[in-house]
Amino acid sequence: MGALRDVGRPPNAIGSAVVSDLSPVFGTVRVEIRRLDPDLPLPRYAHPGDAGADLVTAEDVVLAPGERATVRTGIAIALPDGYAAFIHPRSGLAARHGLTVVNAPGTVDAGYRGEIKVPLLNTDPATPVKLTRGDRIAQLVIQRVERAAFVEVDELSDSARGAGGFGSTGGHAAGAEQS
């Protein structure tokens, strides 16, 4: 087993209630938020133009290689009808530590009012990952969503792709026989 890695956190993460400026390019939607842990920061956008707001862990967690855990964030939200939130992995955690969100992206429906929890997985084969309360662990992306009116038909209309599915466009030579 490798040395324990600490993923770190931004300065003043615990207890800060910094709200970053929203880019004028993006529209805004009012999202009510309930802070279940008063010492943790609210989700925030790190940079203007960012699509995802950082979520932090409400607890200390150590994930052994290959281990998964559902981690509390200390917040609950109320999305307006017609919106959903999607929980995405943080690219730096995935690239540097092998830490990812198991069901990426996780979906938070507009009607859900419970605590947002993030199912994390340490994909590193040898090194445990240490998360300290207040560490940024995932990103929350709020999106407008449409509801489908499903209409059963006997045949589907044609398309250029047709029924081509997994790997139908090629793009790699893995497993191909060489002559």
From Swiss-Prot:
Q: Give the GO terms filed under biological process for this record.
A: dUMP biosynthetic process; dUTP catabolic process
Q: What is its EC number?
A: 3.6.1.23
Which cofactors are named for this entry? Mg(2+)
Write out the entry's keywords from A to Z. Hydrolase, Magnesium, Metal-binding, Nucleotide metabolism
**Source taxon at top rank:** Bacteria
UniProt catalytic activity: dUTP + H2O = dUMP + diphosphate + H(+)
Family annotation (Pfam families): dUTPase
Q: Which InterPro entries match?
A: dUTPase, dUTPase-like, dUTPase-like_sf, dUTPase_trimeric
Query: In Gene Ontology terms, what is one molecular function of this protein?
Result: dUTP diphosphatase activity
Query: Which residue ranges run through the membrane?
Result: none
User: If you read the UniProt record, what top EC class would you report for this enzyme, in one word?
Assistant: hydrolase
Q: Which family does it belong to?
A: Belongs to the dUTPase family.
Q: What does this protein do?
A: This enzyme is involved in nucleotide metabolism: it produces dUMP, the immediate precursor of thymidine nucleotides and it decreases the intracellular concentration of dUTP so that uracil cannot be incorporated into DNA.
What is this protein called in UniProt? Deoxyuridine 5'-triphosphate nucleotidohydrolase
